[in-house]
Amino acid sequence: KERTYLYKIMNRASVLALDKNRVWHVRKKLSMNEMKKGAKLLTGTHDFSAYRSSSCTAKSPIRTIKKISIKKNRNGKIIIRFVSKSFLQKQVRSMVGCLKFLGEGKWDISTFKKTLNSKKRSLCAPPAPACGLYLEKVKY
């Protein structure tokens, strides 16, 4: 069993008409290298308490992220894929928000790591908007 979510960020000055309200528009150039370093830290089994919604009713905040891939096309669209057996409420959007902070230089990798290990929602970046989130695949 596994689910694949993808999140779309348009990383350029303007959004293409077809992508309006279907991507998160981020004008500031994001560092793909920094975001990939963060994705590597999120991969594996962790306590994702810092990344869950305050209204999340899951019994355990421990989840295993099997894979995170980040790709950017020529038009500036960044696609981030997350693969796991299950996710917490708002977990993917919260992880994307933190990866964005890392990519734009608001956080360094040690701050990113501290947030993951803190288990405190208050230290997490704001969750990314829902408009860029897609459930791509479910395997039974």
Model-assigned labels for residue ranges:
Residues 1-140:
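Structured-RNA-binding interfaces characteristic of tRNA pseudouridine synthases
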